[in-house]
Amino acid sequence: MTPAGERPRVGVIMGSDSDWPVMADAAAALAEFDIPAEVRVVSAHRTPEAMFSYARGAAERGLEVIIAGAGGAAHLPGMVAAATPLPVIGVPVPLGRLDGLDSLLSIVQMPAGVPVATVSIGGAGNAGLLAVRMLGAANPQLRARIVAFQDRLADVVAAKDAELQRLAGKLTRD
């Protein structure tokens, strides 16, 4: 994830390695913008002391944002947010039961004073992009890359619209 010698700026953590298929999208979004990241399994329930140590030391290690994914009870994002001054982005990971709705509700229902920015169920890619935007707020070069990314998205939509109009035109003329 992080090229040799570069300090990670974003932590991508999850409660279990089984969350990686979802959380890999966050890592991919960060990599697309050349944002160095570290990826770790940090369980709120199985390794609470390690989780608190990770969260408390994150800023000193140079992290600027933490993306935390969890399923089920999904306490990881909130507990990390309680232990760090850094922004935390929560990713509800869908499990076999309730399709991630339980995780979403757990992550968004934070008490006053302990904010967790929350993306959609399984929305780790958007979590990565949100972290990029947070970092880009103070970095004009990164902000320019974000604008270029948005322009590419708009171009894709325009191309799809043109193709749909072409196909629909054939259907309505026949």
From Swiss-Prot:
Pathway: Purine metabolism; IMP biosynthesis via de novo pathway; 5-amino-1-(5-phospho-D-ribosyl)imidazole-4-carboxylate from 5-amino-1-(5-phospho-D-ribosyl)imidazole (N5-CAIR route): step 2/2. The keyword Isomerase applies. It comes from the Bacteria. The keyword Isomerase applies. Substrate binds at residues 16, 19, 46. It catalyses: 5-carboxyamino-1-(5-phospho-D-ribosyl)imidazole + H(+) = 5-amino-1-(5-phospho-D-ribosyl)imidazole-4-carboxylate. Disulfide bonds: none annotated. Its EC number is 5.4.99.18. GO terms for molecular function: 5-(carboxyamino)imidazole ribonucleotide mutase activity. GO terms for biological process: 'de novo' IMP biosynthetic process. It holds the Pfam family AIRC. InterPro entries: PurE_ClassI, PurE_dom, PurE_prokaryotes. Keywords: Isomerase, Purine biosynthesis. Catalyzes the conversion of N5-carboxyaminoimidazole ribonucleotide (N5-CAIR) to 4-carboxy-5-aminoimidazole ribonucleotide (CAIR). Was identified as a high-confidence drug target. Belongs to the AIR carboxylase family. Class I subfamily. This is N5-carboxyaminoimidazole ribonucleotide mutase. It comes from Mycobacterium tuberculosis (strain ATCC 25618 / H37Rv). The gene is purE.
